[in-house]
């Protein structure tokens, strides 16, 4: 599954601020679509746009990213994976004097994007003075940013990028919740929990910290101004100061915001999921501009001459000029809560929970489905792909949805089987279908015959969620809380079936806990069991004859003593990469373990990586390029791993980057190797420069010799030796060094 074109971090930020030359953009687009090793990428739901700001281009913010759109509708995203320090954006504002974008987060941290820099202003975030430091809005006022918070107005120096002062509209220097500030040429207005206040301005700064209370407008929640005219906006009423009677009222809709302009006031409002945009003229008559055809929950707006941009928290970004259209920002259209599936061609991600449909991800990017072949999709909770015909399968309650891509045909299948809802489905390599029905048992399809295999005991509903099937035809199923692990085994014709329950007792499983949360099959056939107390590893034969006890891997802890691997961690999910390493999702982030679990290679959390949340629900690994997808309690992100699936036969390999530019200091990857290959790199005369083992089907070189020195400019040859000792030349790589 190829990746989308990417820019380097500095190129990206320059492009993001509208400073990118077209040649750079074309160069980036012409590069291989494979992202660099170790790169993180966000796969967020971008259908909810929350904030807009008009600068040299249009800037906007979804829940976790900011984006820019230029005059040609080229879209660039900036998130935690390429420079931002946080997620969950509270407000944005454009500073036209310094040409920089200010971003405030819900945790009260602040970033400023200026040129190729992202500057963090963490003073509010780090302060211990106030318990509630929530940021509500930002106003740019000359060289200052007025940040309205739950304790007052923080003045930020936009030149020095530091806190200048804190203002309190109640004149007491006591914390006062401030929602928004707005200004005219000579006055500053502050909307607070105690009402509306104003004070005099001179040279964009208050002349004294003496604020006057403005009576009335008790229902106001927003402010807007144009020249000397100030508006106070409530849920049902809009006022033009100093008049205390409304100039506009609505009885049904809720006013979300309003924006003053030279010909009146634009009003965005909604009734449930039906939104509208109105223009209130200077004579206080309204004209309808947009309705629910495009708008559902409009929340913000930006105006650029004859173009109106609207941020909608349900419908995304809408633009109106000579025509009206919705601008697609990509990504899955909903948060992924179903159980996904990935192979070398597609990632399928059911929405699950409340919304019918799913997202697919391929070399063409994200595509969202609420219908297939004209059929409305129900709520889908799990997905798989049949390896024999590449058709897509989904779970839909007690039925299955089968979609044939080549014929664009869809059918709902309700086999005469068990009555429970499907919670997981999968196919063996030879195309045998396995389905797990909650509270009921296993459904299997082989040779077009459906077979039902009921559970040996009565289960409560919502007890069975996950299952893996090995090459022996054994199904491994975590039981409900404190019920251990169940194993199903049968002969080929199902004439004999065996169920076995494994628990913490010796000779009966030796699991680290009876609360089993996850199970995974590794590349050697071992079963890895994740519990609420770490991991156990099973290597079992015929369960009707043999004892099946788990091996509990140990690892040195921070004190140097041996302890059980991930002891006291809740292991929510386990995935196996091409090098048989284990990616483990917990309540405390992601752990990458060596193949045998004897060492921890990486530990990613929201504090040291772009993970939006430390609770990991599912991990999916794309085998061809090694991209690892993490579905968290918030959103989905991915990481370009160093291991891929090995090929069956060695042929010419992919080397990237190649040629290696003088400024490049990252890893050089050799992809398309047979598993566990020995890779040798020689100079043109045949002298050995470096050798290494592949991680699955990919080897990594840092561009240095075995002695640790950077190699000289030149052409280098790549040789590969497989486990049988066969060696062949598979490629060349060009190294160029700077002067």
Please describe what each predicted stretch is:
Residues 1-37:
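Bacterial Sec-dependent N-terminal signal peptides
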Residues 14, 30-653, 678, 688, ...:
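Carboxylate-rich, polar loop motifs that coordinate divalent cations or form catalytic acidic clusters
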Residues 21, 30, 642-647, 655-660, ...:
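Terminal processing/anchoring signals of secreted or surface-associated proteins
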Residues 25, 647-680, 698-701:
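Glycine-centered coil/turn sites that cap beta-strands in beta-rich domains
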Residues 125, 170, 695-696, 734:
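A generic structural motif
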Residues 690-692:
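Short beta-strand in the C-terminal region of the ABC ATPase nucleotide-binding domain
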Residues 694-725:
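Short, surface-exposed loop/turn motifs with a glycine/proline- and acidic-biased composition
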Residues 717-739:
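C-terminal tail/sorting-segment detector
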